[in-house]
Amino acid sequence: MLLQLVKKVENIETMEKEKFQIEFPINSSKGVLYNCMSTPSGLAEWFCDDVNIKKDVHTFLWDGSEEVARLVSKKKDEFVKFKWIEDEENGESNYFELRIKVDEMTGERAVIITDFAEEDEIQDAKELWIAQLENLRRVIGG
């Protein structure tokens, strides 16, 4: 009983993040979508104001602030996966992933976002991703 109470207190103190996903239909080729997810110029068109890359470390710039993430894996025309450096330094296993999904029956495409947020921030995080994905759709005309 005491151990359970201690675990609950630890979870409250660390505010563990919960995984969530969003699937967003986008009418575009896999190549165009992948380019928008994986290159500095592509990301700067919809995700951030600018991005600087040094090896696998991406520095994303938004309205004068910056966040740094490491590209941990990618597969051409399928997905890119990043970990925020701050989360990495804190020993957290959180990441965010941008994945291209193609429905084999209809050929329709979607971008699937996987991300993590604190429970009380999930809705805000989803709304932010949806706004970003609407920017992507506008940029590529899909």
Predicted regions and their residues:
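A conserved amphipathic terminal alpha-helix motif
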Residues: 116-142
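Hydrophobic-ligand binding "helix-grip"
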Residues: 53, 61-110, 114-118
